[in-house]
Design a protein with these regions (language model features):
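Mg2+/Mn2+-dependent nuclease catalytic core
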Residues: 115-178
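Metal-dependent nuclease catalytic cores that hydrolyze phosphodiester bonds in DNA/RNA
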Residues: 1-129
Length: 178
């Protein structure tokens, strides 16, 4: 059973617009900021295009669609589980439950005191916004948690964007909450 922390920090919901250039969030002051995933996607565009050429457009589209579906399902399973839903896995494909079960022991043994899940964060300094998966204590320390799925293990140098995304969420959270 996970504890959910009542905190004094208000994180406002943001309107979201999907444009041809990517997702944009509108802050309470009316500022429009690109999402962190849109910004990071621009940085990795060349690598993605090279991969598509290597495997072929049809294969790349198939892999991308499968990855997106799997990622969404595992993310929803994690959210349900952290929200202490009794039927957290009902209606999900066995393969997605299997994938979630690889992170379940880490959640059970190291995560608690959940501050927020699926909340928007933005930075007026960086002029970027995004939606963080979870803010909770990991081993007793308040931490940004972003769930990622992959078919294969990845080297650190391949996932620099993950670290940049997490660093952005931490900076935006600090900016909004002090």
């Amino acid at each position: 059973m996970f504890d959910h922390v009542q905190n004094d920090h208000y994180l406002p919901e943001l309107d979201c617009e999907t444009l041809a250039s990517g997702r944009t969030y509108v802050t309470p002051e009316g500022n429009k900021y690109p999402s962190i995933t849109t910004v990071l996607g621009e940085l990795s565009k060349a690598g993605i295009e090279a991969w598509k050429k290597r495997v072929g457009e049809e294969t790349a589209n198939k892999i991308s669609a499968q990855a997106s579906t799997r990622g969404t399902a595992v993310h929803e399973l994690a959210e349900n589980y952290l929200n202490n839903k009794e039927d957290w896995s009902k209606g999900y494909m066995p393969a997605n439950i299997f994938t979630f079960n690889t992170i379940k022991p880490v959640l059970e043994s190291r995560v608690n005191n959940i501050w927020a899940q699926e909340v928007p964060l933005y930075s007026d300094k960086l002029e970027i916004a995004g939606r963080v998966d979870c803010i909770a204590e990991l081993d007793g320390e308040l931490t940004i948690i972003d769930f990622k799925t992959s078919r294969k293990p990845k080297k650190k140098e391949w996932i620099e964007n993950y670290f940049l995304q997490g660093a952005f969420y931490a900076a935006a959270f600090f900016e909004q909450t002090g």
